[in-house]
Swiss-Prot record:
InterPro entries: GspF/PilC, T2SS_GspF/T4SS_PilC_CS, T2SS_GspF_dom, T2SS_GspF_sf. It is found in: Cell inner membrane. This is Type IV pilin assembly protein PilC. The chain crosses the membrane at residues 178-198, 221-241, 381-401. It comes from Vibrio cholerae serotype O1 (strain ATCC 39315 / El Tor Inaba N16961). Keywords: Cell inner membrane, Cell membrane, Fimbrium biogenesis, Membrane, Protein transport, Transmembrane, Transmembrane helix, Transport. PROSITE patterns: T2SP_F. The gene is pilC. It is a multi-pass membrane protein. Its main location: membrane. The keyword Cell inner membrane applies.
C-alpha cells in the first residue's frame, strides 16, 4: 500500500453551543471536516454552522510539516515509549501540544486509527507520505517483534544523523553559489550603470580606445540590450531541465553523474550518498528487516539517481546469490575501503556494525570538507572575483592611462 499524500490544510469557521448552552464560535485549521467535528465533539460543542475557507499562504507555510518535524516527533515517541508511556497516549501528548496544525491533523488521524485497532505502521502509512517506506517498514518490524521503543530509538538516531548530513551538504552548495551570484550581480551593475558613464567620458577623448576596452564596451551594450532575454532563456532552460529530469530517468541519471564530477562539491555529494546508504542499510538490517528488503528500501531513499541505480544492481545480484561486497564492486560506485568493510561485515556476521562504521567515517569526512570549504575555495574565489570584477575595472582605466602617457 502506498502512503497517502497529506491533504492540504483548510480553514474551518464554526458556530455552535457549548455544554453550558452558551453560543460559541471560532475557526480551526484542519485537513478535513471530520477532524473538526471530532475535535469540537471532544470539547462538548454542538455544531450549528460549519464553513470551509481558504488558508493564507503565510499560514500554509507556517503550519507545513517538514522532514525535521518528523525527526523531532520520532525522538519524542522514542523517549516516551522507552519510559513506558503507551503509544496512544504518546501520540495524543505530542499532537495536543504541537504548534503546527498539519502535524496535529496527521497525529489525530493516526491516533484515531490506532484506537480503532489499526496497527501503528498501517495508520502512519495511510495518514501521510511524510512516513516513507523505510519508516513504516521499521515500525512494522518493531510491532511484530514487540520492540517498538528500540525501533523508534534507532529511527530517531538515523533521522537525526541524516538531517545533520543534509544540512552539511546544503551548506556546501550554498557557499559557492552565493559567491557566484554576488560576482554576477556586481558585474551586471558595473556593465549597466558604471561602464556607460565611462563610455560617455571616453567619447570626449577623440582617440581610438584599447582593444580590451572596446570588447568590454561591446559586452556592456549587449548586456543592456539582451540581459532580460538572457535571463528568460536561462530560466526557461532551468525549468526545461527540471521537466526533463521529472519525465526521463536517463536525464536524471546523467545529471546526477555530472553533479558528482564537480570539483569539491561532487566529492561531498558522493560521500554524503555513501554515508546515507550505509546508515540506512545498517538501520534497516539491525532492526530485523532481511538484507534484500533492506537494499530495496535503501535504494528508494538514496537521494541520488546514480547511487539508486547502483543499489538496485546490488539488490539484483545479491538476490541471485552473489555476496553483497562483490555485487557492490561490480557497480564501480563504491570506494575500495567501503567494499573491504562490507566484506568483513558479511564474513563476521556483523554487517550492521561495519555499515555504521562506514557511515560514521564518511559523515566525518563530509563534516571536515564542509567546515574547511571556506579555506579550500578562498583562493579560487579571489582569482574569480579578481578576473571578473578586476578585469572590468582595468578595461575602464586603460584609456585614461594611455591618455596620461600621451600628455606626459
Amino acid at each position: 500500500m502506498k502512503a497517502t499524500q497529506t491533504l492540504p490544510l483548510k480553514n474551518y469557521r464554526w458556530k455552535g453551543i457549548n455544554s453550558n448552552g452558551k453560543k460559541v464560535s471560532g475557526q480551526m485549521l484542519a485537513i478535513s471536516e471530520i477532524e473538526v467535528r471530532d475535535k469540537l465533539k471532544d470539547q462538548h460543542i454542538q455544531i450549528k454552522k460549519l464553513k470551509k475557507g481558504s488558508v493564507s499562504l503565510l499560514a500554509r507555510l507556517t503550519h507545513r510539516v517538514k522532514s525535521k518535524d518528523i525527526t523531532i516527533l520520532t525522538r519524542q515517541l522514542a523517549t516516551m515509549l522507552t519510559t513506558g508511556v503507551p503509544i496512544v497516549q504518546a501520540l495524543k501528548l505530542v499532537g495536543d501540544n504541537h504548534r503546527k496544525a498539519e502535524m496535529k491533523s496527521i497525529l489525530a488521524q493516526i491516533t484515531k486509527s490506532v484506537e480503532a485497532g489499526t496497527p501503528l505502521s498501517k495508520a502512519m502509512r495511510t495518514a501521510s507520505a511524510h512516513f516513507d517506506t523505510l519508516y513504516v517498514d521499521l515500525v512494522e518490524t518493531g510491532e511484530m517483534s514487540g520492540n517498538l521503543p528500540e525501533v523508534f530509538e534507532r529511527l530517531a538516531t538515523y533521522r537525526e544523523k541524516s538531517e545533520q548530513l543534509r544540512a552539511k551538504v546544503i551548506k556546501a552548495l550554498i557557499y559557492p553559489s552565493m559567491v557566484v551570484l554576488v560576482a554576477l550581480g556586481v558585474s551586471y551593475l558595473m556593465l549597466t550603470m558604471v561602464i556607460p558613464e565611462f563610455e560617455s567620458m571616453f567619447k570626449g577623448f577623440g582617440a581610438e580606445l584599447p582593444w580590451f576596452t572596446q570588447q568590454v564596451l561591446k559586452l556592456s551594450h549587449w548586456v543592456q540590450a539582451y540581459s532580460l532575454w538572457a535571463f528568460i532563456a536561462i530560466a526557461a532552460a532551468i525549468f526545461g531541465l527540471k521537466a526533463l529530469r521529472k519525465n526521463s530517468f536517463q536525464i536524471r541519471l546523467k545529471t546526477s553523474r555530472l553533479g558528482l564530477k564537480f570539483p569539491i562539491i561532487g566529492n561531498v555529494l558522493a560521500k554524503a550518498s555513501i554515508a546515507k546508504f550505509s546508515r540506512t542499510l545498517a538501520t534497516s538490517f539491525a532492526a530485523g528487516i532481511p538484507i534484500l528488503a533492506s537494499l530495496k528500501t535503501t535504494a528508494k531513499t538514496s537521494g541520488n539517481v546514480h547511487f539508486e541505480t547502483a543499489i538496485n544492481e546490488v539488490y539484483r545480484d545479491t538476490a541471485a546469490g552473489m555476496p553483497m561486497y562483490i555485487a557492490m564492486r561490480n557497480t564501480e560506485a563504491f570506494p575500495e575501503m567501503v567494499l573491504q568493510m562490507v566484506m568483513i561485515g558479511e564474513e563476521s556476521g556483523q554487517l550492521d556494525d561495519m555499515l555504521n562504521k562506514v557511515a560514521t567515517i564518511y559523515e566525518f569526512e563530509v563534516d571536515n570538507t564542509v567546515d574547511n570549504l571556506g579555506k579550500i575555495l578562498e583562493p579560487l574565489i579571489i582569482v574569480f572575483l579578481g578576473t571578473v570584477v578586476g578585469g572590468l575595472v582595468v578595461a575602464m582605466y586603460l584609456p585614461i592611462f594611455n591618455l596620461m602617457s600621451v600628455l606626459g
